[in-house]
Amino acid sequence: MPYAELHCHSSYSFLDGASNPEDLVIRAVELGLSGLALTDHDGLYGVVRMAEAAEACGLSTIIGSELSIGVPEPQNGVADPVGSHLLVLANGPEGYRRLAEALTDAYLVEGGRKGRPVHDLDHLAEVADGHWTVLTGCRKGAVRQGLVKGMLQAEAELRRLVDLFGIDNVLVELTDHRAPTDSRDNDLLAELASRHSLLTVATTAAHYAGAEQFELACALSAVRARRSLDEMDGWLPPGPVARLRSGAEMADLFSRHRDAVDNTVAVAERTAFHLKSVRPRLPDQKVPDGHTPISWLRHLVEEGRRACYGDDPVAKDRLATELDLIEDRGFAGYFLIVSDIVEFAQSQGILCQGRGSAAASAVCYALGITVVDPVFYGLPFERFLSVLREEEPDIDVDFDARRREEVIQYVYAKYGRRNAAQVADVITYRPRSAVRDMAKALGYSQGQQDAWSRRSEERRVGKECCNMCRSRWSPYH
C-alpha cells in the first residue's frame, strides 16, 4: 500500500523526538514508504542530516516544521504544553526559503526567544504566499482542538486557515494515537473536509522510528516536563503509537478513510525536493558606481596582484583563471563580503587570518584574506573551488577571540541582523547528565541521582544503569 509520512519529529524536536534523522530514514525505507517529511518543532535543525541520509537511501524527502502558536513562555517544565500547532510543509526550494524566513522572524521579533517563538498567523500567510502546504495538525492543531467546543468552533478554525493560506494549500490531517476520541474526531474532521472541498491526509505524527524507542520517548517527555514517569502517567500514551507505520498498517488503521492514506503520496510528490537545490542568497553588495560585484572584485584583486606579485605572468594567469570561475559560479559577492570583514578587522587592529582550503586561492591571497602564497607553493585552486563540484566556496577566518564580538557587531550593523547568523553545535547529553536526568525521571532520590552520575564518569554505569531502569519502570506494567 503506497504511503508517505507527512508528519514526523526527530531528536531535533528537543526532548520530544526520540530518534535521529538517519534512523527515521532507515526505518522509512524498511517500511517501504514513498516519502518522509521531517517536521520538527519550530526549527529546521535536522534537515541536512535527513536529506543526506535520504539521498543515500533513495527516499523522497519533504521538509517542514510544526509551528507553535500562542506560546506565552518556554514550555519546559510543563506536562502538556499550551498553545496550538500548525504543520507546514515547504513546496520546493522557494517554500523552504520562506519557511526559514518565518522561523527566523519568530525568534527575532519582540518577545521571541529560545523555547518561545512568536508566530502570527497573518504574518505566516503573508510570508508563505502560496508556497506552503498547511496541515491542520494533530491533537494540538487548532481545528482538532476546536472539536472540544463543537463543530462550529472547529469549522471556524478551518475557515480561518483556508482564508489565510488558500483552499489549494490546506489539508485536513487525520491522526489516530488510540485515544478514546481519536476515531470520532477523525470522522468529524473528514466531514468538515468534505464540506469545504478539502483533501484529508492520514499521518502518524511520528516521534520515533520504531516501538523499541517508546520507553526512551516517555523518559524524554518526563525530563522535559521535569517530572518523574509516575507523575507523567496520565499524559503518556499507552503504547508505541507514535512510531513510523507502513502503508498497510495505515490502511488498516484508517480503514474508513482510505483516501486519506492515498492522498499522502500525491502530496509528497508535489512537495519533495532535493536540499542541494537550495542556494544561499547573499546580501546586496554596495559597490562603487559603474561597477558590478564581479567588476569590483576584479579591481580589488588587480590592486592586490600588483602589491603581491608585481608583473609575475604565472600569477596573472592564475588570478584570471580563478576570477573567471568565480564569475561563472556567481560567487563574487561572497568574496567581497569576506574581504570586507577582514579589512574591517585589520583596520581595527584585530588579529585575523584565513585558513583551510582557502589558502589554495590566489584571489584570497591577493585580497589579504590569507597569508600563504598558493602560486609560490603550487597549491591547486581546485582544492578550494572546482568546476567539477557543485558546492559553494567555504572561507574560514579566525579572529582574536577577545575581540571577536566587535567583528560580529560590525557584520550585523552593515549587512542586517536577518542577513547574518552564527553557527553553533547542538549540545547533546554527556553520560553524567544523561544518567542524572534519567534517574530523576525514574523517580530516584537526589542522592541516588548524584551517586549514579558520578559512577558514569568511571565508565561503569552504562549497561548496569539501563538494566536498573528497565526493572524500575515499564509502560506496560
Where are these regions (language model features)?
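Phosphodiester-processing cores and adjacent nucleic acid-binding clamps
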Residues: 1-457
